[in-house]
Amino acid sequence: MHAKNDIMNKHLPFFLVLLTLFSCDISRNRGSEMYLPGPAIRDGYSPMGLVEELQYSGSVPGPTHRRMIVYLPPDYYRTERRFPVLYLLHGARGYETSWIRKGHVYQSTDSLWREGLAEPCIVVMPNVNQYKDDEDYEGGRFKGAWESILEVDGTVEYAFVHDVVNLVDSLYRTVPDKAHRAVAGLSIGGYQSIYLAANHPDIFGYIGSMSPYTWCKGRDHGYRKLFYGHLYQKMAAQFADEPPLGFYLYAGKWDIMLPSTQGIHHRMKRKGFSHEFSKYSAGHGWNNGWIEVYKDMLKKLFKNEDTNRNQ
């Protein structure tokens, strides 16, 4: 550990200069800035890889200052290699650090990288809320999950594809094709992952949906039409024209979303949509459930293509 800290201390000025120069260029051209995050973004842990916080201006009405956390493989700045990208989405009342503070994403990712069980990739954790700058509420009132989900077919989708994905591809050495992009999330983020991939099958080759929020409660607020209507039409086109390279669906045995997630699984199975469905021994929460599911999914990503591409 001391040797690792010595190495980081030795090279920290280089990274600071590099990021400062990079930030100036980004600010001038894209209205964005990159920072080395403080200890809070690291959750008191010293990750193997490099953590960067990217702040940028949104292109849709509403929030103007957006943030995302980018976790780079340990050798990112020591090689010319290009890497696949995993976009990891939070749930309701979440934000860009939820996977860090509650999901211990650095520890889980590092353990798999260390053992060679997962492909090195860039992990991007954006804030996909569109209510108020980087917060999951509006005017001090938490939005209901059903209100949040309606926004995926609109501002969230547009901002995610045009702001987040395009920005990441322009700033980092990615492999900018569907075979090297994954989108995954939990709860509302799990639903958003399905929907984003269905709307953009040419962009996302891998989908991970953990306990996707699909609870209507009988309300007639447009959500039923959104989910049970044209989503499956979009998925039919997706699987016919641009089939995913991997589609992973999860729900806990004591998960409030288990019945509806099983419904998605059975409907996909009837329609011949290739996917994997797994149940884990937990409920709808972080208590080992989503953390272990994340590790299971990460081991499966980017296995169908050679990701060891050079510039």
Stretches found by the model and what they are:
Residues 9-17:
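Sec-dependent signal peptide recognition
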Residues 18-19, 306:
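Prokaryotic Sec-type signal peptides and long signal-anchor helices
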Residues 22-23:
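C-terminal motif of bacterial Sec signal peptides marking the signal peptidase cleavage site
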Residues 26-311:
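Non-catalytic cap/lid and distal C-terminal segments of serine-dependent acyl enzymes
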